[in-house]
Amino acid sequence: MTVRVSFLIGCLGALTLPAALADNGRLIATGGASSIEGTAGGGLTPWAVLAGYGEQHEWGATAFATTVNLPDYRLDVAGVALAYDNRVELSFARQRFDLGSLVHKLNLPEDSLGQDVLGLKVRLFGDVVYDTLPQVSLGLEYKHQTDFEIPRLVGAKRDSDVEGYLAASRLFMGAAFGYNVLVNGSLRYSRANETGLLGFGGDRRDSRSLLKEGSLALLLNPRWAVGVEYREKPDNLSFAGESDWADVFVGYFPNKHVSFVLAYAHLGEIATLDHQNGSYLSVQGSF
């Protein structure tokens, strides 16, 4: 799978919703972007916000395409998300991870790994802007690794799993020299190897770990945002170390229907190859 503009346009055209589509509703950029697992949030981490800009009794929806180019690998992701009543979100993402030079280095039987991610997120309480409490959401993700031969060879125990996370998001108005600041923190309960692309559990550890994730975004104006993300990851496989992930990003939100995120992703060691740092680009359409 390669990321093509035509795919994104097709996804957007396929999203048919009732007449109560969100148009005004939440502040621009507070719907976030799309994470690599399909849910609303940052690129690497989910936020407590839901897809699109729908409020009470309104629908919201997004479709996105993301590509991450690294020295030895490439990750392509495409997906959609649908939310209703600013209460519940369903999402789906399909990932393809090209193994690049690792194929010849380790004489691998496949040249890529794939994963499908089906997500459910429910807002428990609060609001990212208008409540005294932060918006808090609970999420579940069912992940299925679709090319399990390589993960099995390196020690992964299973090709699918369910993981949960709890996220809290809050927009602080004028908090940084007059600029708005969005803060998100998440706890994930997971045993995924490289987010599931290398299966789940391993010869070193097969139980789930409680993992920290966070995002900080400075809204320079209603259309531009800059920020950082961090994602802690487990270390379940003995054949290679697994680095925590981080990025520095710039987001552009010209209106509520399209957004662009460009980032420098610091992903460290992936499957024995270190210094996997490179560019991240995501395009999202919203309703």
For the regions a language model picked out, list residue spans one by one:
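Small side chains
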Residues: 10-13, 139, 227, 285
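Detector for outer-membrane/organellar transmembrane beta-barrel domains
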Residues: 156-236, 244-245
